[in-house]
UniProtKB/Swiss-Prot annotation:
MF terms (GO), sorted A to Z: GTP binding; GTPase activity; metal ion binding; rRNA binding
Enzyme Commission designation: 3.6.1.-
Protein name per UniProt: Small ribosomal subunit biogenesis GTPase RsgA
A single cellular component GO annotation: cytoplasm
Binding site for GTP: 163-166, 219-227
InterPro entries to which the protein is assigned, alphabetical: G_CP_dom, NA-bd_OB-fold, P-loop_NTPase, Ribosome_biogen_GTPase_RsgA, RsgA_GTPase_dom
Function: One of several proteins that assist in the late maturation steps of the functional core of the 30S ribosomal subunit. Helps release RbfA from mature subunits. May play a role in the assembly of ribosomal proteins into the subunit. Circularly permuted GTPase that catalyzes slow GTP hydrolysis, GTPase activity is stimulated by the 30S ribosomal subunit.
Organism: Marinobacter nauticus (strain ATCC 700491 / DSM 11845 / VT8) (Marinobacter aquaeolei)
Cofactor, how bound (note): Binds 1 zinc ion per subunit.
Pfam families reported for this sequence: RsgA_GTPase
Localization per Swiss-Prot or TrEMBL: Cytoplasm
NCBIfam families for this protein: PRK12288.1, ribosome small subunit-dependent GTPase A
Necessary cofactors: Zn(2+)
Amino acid sequence: MAKRRLNKRQQWRIEKIQKERTVRAARKEKAVEEQAAAGELGPEQNGLVIAHYGQQLDIEALEGPESGQVFRCFVRANIDSLVTGDRVVWRPGKSKTGVIVARCERENLLQRPDNFGALKPVAANIDHIILVIAPEPEPHDNLIDRYLVASESSDIPAVILLNKTDLINDDNRDQIEALLARYQALGYEVARTSAAETAGTPAPEVEALVRNQTSVFVGQSGVGKSSIIQTLLPDELLRVGAVSESTGKGVHTTTTAKLFHLPGGGDLIDSPGIREFGLWHMTPQEVEYGFREIRPLIGLCKFRNCRHMGDPGCALDAAAEAGDISPERLKSFHRILQDMTDQQARGLKLT
């Protein structure tokens, strides 16, 4: 469906609203700066980034009499990019505002390249990635493998969660079972659920995954990430979209990465849907490392410059012939490498 064109009045109104928001934000930031200059800010303390709105972030106080309260904070210009899940040092101001003065060291960082090749952080300090797939939209090995390569390169464990099990039928059952079996054979944890069948209550299998963990849900649009989160956090207002009947693709429903505290313990980060998880910022060697069954074969090819594309003496081809690498995973590996080559041919470089 083509995008609806806006008339001049609509464009003017949108620009006016954006300008007003910018002015309000600048006014608040100036007020906080004046408080800092006057010595009116509170003492430095630890906080947690629970939401990100451009230059403003929601920080939850982690200590002191205001522990658990949320403050809208501004970021000092000398601080690198912050993401949901970051732990920071901040100073409270008036009217639930504050200033972030430092970012604490990260345990890990999940990031991906944007359409221009620049790395964009997604979430920090997470215990595992929950990769949600579903019978509809149809799951594809290549997209799943992109997420798994990203998790392996970040040293963040990944769990594959099959949602919408109520949509499994005789037409797709064998394909889905074969797909899940491939990843279980590689040692990946696989869980199953159906948010539509839990009547709004959290499924025990999902609660077990997220309990006392900091989790981030990823997956293509339409697989039901927001629906699952809504069962875990029924009091939170999350917009839930349906799969488009015309395209079969999902509709993005989450626009801002947010961190939620779970009633049963643990935290959950819900980030905007990601349709394509590009890996062109990686080297071929890093992609090799991201495939668990290929990792032990690194450096075993006959020639050091082996491209793993049918070259003589390729250790990957030998492993595939021996059944140690599935045809689907090898095809996915080749496609990722080809995508990287295509991006380089287009002149895409990291900034």
